[in-house]
Every structure is written in C-alpha cells, then in structure tokens.
Amino acid sequence: MNRWKTSLIILMLSLTSACVMQPVVYDEARAQALESALASFRAREELTRFFDQAVAYAVFPANWRAGTGFGGAFGTGWLLEGGEVTGRALMVEAFVGANLGIQGDRKILFFRSEAALDQFKRGRFEFTGQANASVANVGKAITPGYNPDVAMFVEVRGGLMVEASVGTQRYDYFPLQESE
C-alpha cells in the first residue's frame, strides 16, 4: 500500500512538472494579436500618460469571462519591457456578485515601478478590488488607479454579460525562452 502511494505521488509530480517544462512560444499569430491590442490601447488618449510613465506593461489580447452569480475569467498575455516581449503571463480571475453571461475583453497592466514589475515577475501576483458593469459591447471596468504601482484598463470586446461584481485576479509569469 505504501509503495503504491509513493508510486502515485511520483507519477503525479512527473506529469505536473512536464506541464511546467513546456517552452513559452511567441509566434507570428500571437505577435499579431498583441500588436492589434496594443494599437487599440495606444489609440486611447487617456492612456498616453500611463504608457509614458510605465517601466513595463502586460497586454492580454483575448480574455474570457463567464458567470452566473459566481464567475471566473481566464486569459493569456505578454509582458513587454522596453518595447520587447520578455515573457508570457496567465490571468485567472474569480468574482462574485450579480452577474450572468459571457464576455470577451482585452486588458493592459501598466507597471509604474521596478518593484511592482519584479513582484509580477516573481509569479502569483494578485490584483484585487476590481468592479465591473457591462452589457453586450458597451462596458466599463473600474479599478483603483494603482495597486500601488500597477494600473489596469479593460476594453470589452463582445458577448452579453450583465454584471455588477467584485473579484480578484491572479497572474503567473513565465519568461520567454530563446528559440533554437
């Protein structure tokens, strides 16, 4: 029995570590999605000062949210430092409140300090206090200006979600591997 448990644990650890060891790939399709999202954010005049002040920013070109009272969201994005992609970020969100539907959005996080950027890159970065209200393609996402040195902006892209909820987001960072 003990040998069986040990074998099961070793098998589970091997399977999960294999998932982590996959290289992060930044290909042409992902580059185009990133450029499209960046162009959309750069076109918003109110974000100019954030682009000017940021030491880095993370762009999430396509995120999906769904909820029926309790909800969640998931998205994959890219961290840019000095205009260059340096890694991939995963976003997972949980929220609660009056919500029903599914929605697609894109978001950008601006890092105003090296300390905030380092915290993000260490992984398991959390962003709390988000409040949303949206219906179809018209929507607003309100977040505290900086948390304390991170600002987030969201563009609703589509879907139908009636929502008044509060939630927390967690981000995990994976450095970009050099291609061989």
Model-derived regions: residue spans:
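Small-residue-enriched, tightly packed secondary-structure blocks
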Residues: 20-180
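Bacterial N-terminal signal peptides that target proteins for export
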Residues: 1-8
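C-terminal motif of bacterial Sec signal peptides marking the signal peptidase cleavage site
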Residues: 15-18
